């Protein structure tokens, strides 16, 4: 008999403790946001929409090395290389299927020219899957992105617009390798 009374007291205590917890949470600040009217806080390194950036000179940074497509775990990036008269590579087409993209950021890490960058833009919803396939024209932005002073071809040692090799920033004079032969 006393066992049953103990169970009743224990159950009543559990119920009262639950009610106190519910009423206590009723007066706390709400975590829910009215989304379109109230903007969501995004952390500083939030990975959202992928963009292609330009050099400080206004040229495309992408050199079509295909490292981003190889690094992508879901295979949503496709591109094809083309070459200008002066030997500079650029993507003939660059396509990202955002319906497959998981926004992991591996393409940004693999890019040697910092051409691919992830922005905090996340509002990309659409009614048709075909509209989530972005071409190069949709991805290119007019600015340099996160690294405004970086120019891959000035650092890589390729002659720029009539300047001889060795005159770019932090670049040593070219070495005549034939003089090193015995």
Swiss-Prot record:
Domain 4Fe-4S ferredoxin-type: residue ranges: 52-82, 92-121
Keywords recorded for this protein, A-Z: 4Fe-4S, Cell inner membrane, Cell membrane, Iron, Iron-sulfur, Membrane, Metal-binding, NAD, Quinone, Repeat, Translocase, Ubiquinone
Any matching Pfam family: Fer4_7
What is the membrane topology here?
A: Peripheral membrane protein
Residues involved in [4Fe-4S] cluster 1 binding:
62, 65, 68, 111
* Known EC number: 7.1.1.-
* Superkingdom classification of source: Bacteria
User: What is the official name of this protein in its record?
Assistant: NADH-quinone oxidoreductase subunit I
- Give the encoding gene's name: nuoI
